[in-house]
Amino acid sequence: MTNEWGEVWYYKYDALGRRIEKACPQRNTKTTYLWDGDQVAYQETEKHGKTESLRHCIFNGWELIAQQDSYFKTDLRNHHKTWTQTTNYAVCQPNGQPLALFNPQGKRTWRKAPSSLWGLPLLENWESKQAEPLNPNLLFAGQYFDQESGLAYNRFRYYDPQSGCYLKSDPIGLAGGETPYAYVHNPMGWIDPFGLARCGNLKKNKMGCLQGIKDYLIGI
């Protein structure tokens, strides 16, 4: 993928359609993902071949519960970098989108940028104003937002929050509905974790969403 700044990004996937790596030669950066079933449990980002940050995420179904980060933090007094480790707990919307992170002492360490109904960030450079690099990069349930493209990886398709639609049509064509590029009709309460079939609520477990996909494919 080539973005508007001329950067070329490469993405790798496993046999189950799970993205396991993304890299950009111009930035000399690479991020590797390890999955626990249908969720990214661990990610490591390298820059110039050296580890820059680590992240371990814990989910309850499709909802982020906790996030452990390790990264180099620069001391503004002497500009020395030290390896920092933090644990934060997430508060999420009904659609799975994280609103804020809090440390064990209850202090807010990160909060979501204002966004449109369909997830489009409304303020530029929001993350650069955050005290710590803790952005979960999660959009709605099952979606991982890519800053380099402005798109969200949604397992089997990519979602565009600017248009509120997928970039690829429904794999089963018009059998899936009159609008094969559409996301869910109400993104505040409905989700589509796999990019294949919508689920009525966040609390529905993974098996419930998988059953929804099965019913969807056979036309129930």
Predicted features by range, described:
Residues 4, 15, 26, 36-37, ...:
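Short, ordered coil/turn segments that flank beta-strands lining enzyme active or ligand-binding pockets
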Residues 1-6, 21-27, 42-49, 66-72, ...:
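Beta-turn initiation residues at beta-strand->coil junctions
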Residues 19, 40-41, 64-65, 98, ...:
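Hydrophobic "anchor" residues
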Residues 22, 120-124, 157-167, 171, ...:
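Short, low-complexity export/processing leader segments characterized by acidic and small residues
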Residues 199-220:
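Catalytic toxin/effector domains delivered as secreted proteins or via bacterial secretion systems
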Residues 78-155, 188-190:
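A motif-centric feature for acidic-aromatic and gly/ser/thr-rich catalytic loops and repeats
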Residues 9-18, 31-39, 54-63, 88-96, ...:
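Aromatic-rich beta-strand edge motifs centered on tyrosine
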